[in-house]
Design a protein with these regions (language model features):
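Extracellular glycan-associated modules
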Residues: 1-170
Length: 170
């Protein structure tokens, strides 16, 4: 992003809103990533300082500690809702890392939107901003990379065995 003189604020990217989802935004010039867990809990990563005028790279990286959706192929939900660790980075340097003891086992934002540069429906955190919360910085590039966990051959064998044992028991 490119922050103008006088600072910037606003939504970079959001998916979801008041009842579930996430937002990546600048608040009083500081980068914030917030994960709204079905309005029961909000986990918030924030940079300690407002971004100075000029070009910056801001990134949110989440490392999931589970097997992921691949377990569903074996009628097993054990890969979903597992913990993970989120890290907020500014110009390549980690500014805050927070572990999440649980994640949502599904996506719950059917009535919300995916927005870039503003938030067009409800906000993920009313305590921080009110929509549309238009971005006042210049967004030069946005990259979204999703690395889904991959089942190992040992994971597959274990899940197949569990599915077969369950079928015998039923």
């Amino acid at each position: 992003i490119e922050v103008p003189k006088g600072g910037a604020e606003g939504m970079l990217l959001t998916s979801g809103g008041r009842f579930a989802g996430y937002g990546f935004y600048l608040l009083a010039g500081k980068p914030v990533f917030l994960w709204n867990l079905i309005d029961l809990n909000r986990i918030r990563w924030a940079g300690p300082d407002a971004l100075a005028p000029g070009r910056h790279s801001i990134e949110f990286d989440f490392e999931y500690d589970g097997l992921g959706v691949g377990t569903l192929l074996f009628n097993n939900m054990s890969g979903l809702g597992r913990p993970g660790t989120g890290t907020l980075k500014v110009d390549g340097k980690a500014v805050q890392t927070i572990p999440m003891p649980k994640t949502l086992p599904m996506i719950l934002q059917w009535d919300e939107s995916f927005d870039i540069g503003s938030d067009t429906l409800t906000g993920v955190n009313d305590a921080d901003y009110r929509p549309p919360f238009a971005l006042t910085a210049k967004l030069n590039k946005l990259t979204i990379k999703v690395d889904r966990p991959q089942l190992s051959p040992a994971d597959i064998k274990r899940l197949q065995t569990a599915m077969q044992e369950k079928a015998k028991a039923d």
